Amino acid sequence: MPEKKGSADAKVLHCSFCNKSQHEVRKLIAGPSVFICDECIDLCNDIIREEAQATARAAIRSELPTPAEIKTFLDQYVIGQTSPKRMLAVAVYNHYKRIRHGEIKGDEVELSKSNIMLIGPTGSGKTLLAQTLARMLNVPFVMADATTLTEAGYVGEDVENIIQKLLQNCNYDVEKAQRAIIYIDEIDKISRKSDNPSITRDVSGEGVQQALLKLIEGTVASVPPQGGRKHPNQDFVQVDTTNILFIVGGAFDGLEKVIRDRTEKSGIGFSAAVRAKSERGVGELFSEAEPEDLIKFGLIPELVGRLPVVATLDELDEAVLVQILTEPKNALVKQFQKLFAMEGAELDVRPDALKAISRKALKRKTGARGLRSILEGALLDTMYDLPSQGNVSRVVLEANAVEGVGKPLLIYADESEAASGEKAGRGEVRDAAA
């Protein structure tokens, strides 16, 4: 017979963990010969949640490459630019750490995004740095040219086309696209034409900056599915850009003058100003860039504020260009040696030829970007003839061939072709024009 409520003989149940009675707690849940109260359940949940968060934080640290590891990877492909590489490594590490941090529930601290601006001369490695970062982190990457962008409604591409390209790159996997890296090149070409707000509509300058602003700071962009055109009754793909890392780059021709004018205002006397101008190069001046200089150059203050990490790249000198030709993992000379090896020939680029190529690139003011066209031009005739000549074992490129006053030397493996007087087995050295 069940005990009556309020009976003196009624057994009072207690929590098996905290020993509180059933009258001191809201709920007491029974198990096989044990009881647990709602307060102990809450405590257990808190302990499990804390352990899960600690595990998640440890996973973040273990999965993400450290800034030092990121820089080491960049060193394999990009020569020099130590300071920009360190800044990029820290910024990218913090960005993806921030994304993982946002996945941990229960943390009230919200971390803001730090997008990146790269300032440097043409061919100094801005695009290569961004591409190499994306490859290391195994995230989608898309590159856009700011000069092709116009305000929505005008002829040209609007800023949402960038997101459309990104989706196409990752097969419309929205989750993957929302962790991508977007590089916008030639950002300096959309600077407004004067310091004063535009009176007339500037559809490819300040207007584009305003459109980019929303995308960079984080918004939900509506993109037509599978690259279709927009129309009112269409279902759009929604992409949140909050966790997309934006890197913008530009040569900023003329910015050095803005910086020089600001920094030399305090100079006393004519000789001080002249000496300062002669001693400081473009790269050194760029390193002194302040937000006010970028605004004076023509970027709107809101956009400058959304790009807090500013990395300036140095000008490339002859020695660095020689290193770029030979040292990176996918160095240009190594690429051409691979092409020649496919034809059974060894390519030997002499040190004087490397210097001649570098000097030519400096003269053209194309930086590292011009190295390929110069090397290709020097070897073009040889690459044309080589597949038809099966007995060439070695091609030697010297400075005179780069400068256009000679041709690469061909060394033939067939001893019967050797000129009289040459030692047997030494092979014949012939001019490529022969």
Curated annotation (Swiss-Prot):
CDD domains: RecA-like_ClpX. SMART domains: AAA, ClpB_D2-small, zf-C4_ClpX. Zn(2+) binds at C15, C18, C37, C40. InterPro entries: AAA+_ATPase, ATP-dep_Clp_protease_ClpX, ATPase_AAA_core, Clp_ATPase_C, Clp_protease_ATP-bd_su_ClpX, ClpX_bact, P-loop_NTPase, Znf_CppX_C4. It holds the Pfam family AAA_2. Keywords: ATP-binding, Chaperone, Metal-binding, Nucleotide-binding, Zinc. GO terms for molecular function: ATP binding; ATP hydrolysis activity; ATP-dependent protein folding chaperone; protein dimerization activity; unfolded protein binding; zinc ion binding. Signal peptide: none annotated. It comes from the Bacteria. Residues 3-56 form the ClpX-type ZB domain. ATP binds at P121, T122, G123, S124, G125, K126, T127, L128. Gene3D superfamilies: 1.10.8.60, ClpX chaperone, C4-type zinc finger domain, P-loop containing nucleotide triphosphate hydrolases. One of its GO terms (biological process) is proteolysis involved in protein catabolic process. GO terms for cellular component: HslUV protease complex. ATP-dependent specificity component of the Clp protease. It directs the protease to specific substrates. Can perform chaperone functions in the absence of ClpP. PANTHER family: ATP-DEPENDENT CLP PROTEASE ATP-BINDING SUBUNIT CLPX-LIKE, MITOCHONDRIAL (PTHR48102:SF7), ATP-DEPENDENT CLP PROTEASE ATP-BINDING SUBUNIT CLPX-LIKE, MITOCHONDRIAL-RELATED (PTHR48102). Belongs to the ClpX chaperone family. Component of the ClpX-ClpP complex. Forms a hexameric ring that, in the presence of ATP, binds to fourteen ClpP subunits assembled into a disk-like structure with a central cavity, resembling the structure of eukaryotic proteasomes. This is ATP-dependent Clp protease ATP-binding subunit ClpX. The lineage of its organism: Bacteria, Pseudomonadati, Pseudomonadota, Betaproteobacteria, Burkholderiales.
